[in-house]
């Protein structure tokens, strides 16, 4: 899934957790389970960057509406950390993706299977957009109560 959905799932996990450390650890682990949902491309790289960038700004706004904005920013980082490590490592250094859930190599690999691989559900472009936008707007709506 895209970073917007991972971030909202992480924020909800942190909000429901008994303490921030447990919440952030669970937000990190959630990434691998969320990747069982196979997203579809939401457009060209430029279109995806505009959509995800806009959703990230809405997420940041929602964070500042909460009683603890830095905790929810940390939740976004924790829930996206596998991709934040892998993507730049692959793009800049040409290294294979260690955490990638969309291949059979890397972290948690056992006989070609791993957390998040292979995907269990494949979403269409419209479903992917709906989940990303809808979850971010949901977080914006509930942020005042966190």
Regions found by a protein language model. Give the residues of each.
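N-terminal membrane-targeting hydrophobic helices
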Residues: 1-146
């Amino acid at each position: 899934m895209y970073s917007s959905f991972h971030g909202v799932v992480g924020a909800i996990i942190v909000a429901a957790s008994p303490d921030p450390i447990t919440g952030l650890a669970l937000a990190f682990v959630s990434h691998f389970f969320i990747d069982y949902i196979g997203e579809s491309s939401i457009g060209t790289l430029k279109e995806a960057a505009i959509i995800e960038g806009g959703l990230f700004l809405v997420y940041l706004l929602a964070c500042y509406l909460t009683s603890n904005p830095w905790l929810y920013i940390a939740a976004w980082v924790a829930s996206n950390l596998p991709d934040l490590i892998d993507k730049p490592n692959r793009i800049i250094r040409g290294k294979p993706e260690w955490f990638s859930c969309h291949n059979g190599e890397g972290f948690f690999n056992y006989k070609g299977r791993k957390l998040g691989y292979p995907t269990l559900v494949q979403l269409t472009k419209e479903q992917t957009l709906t989940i990303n936008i809808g979850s971010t707007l949901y977080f914006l709506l509930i942020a005042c109560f966190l």
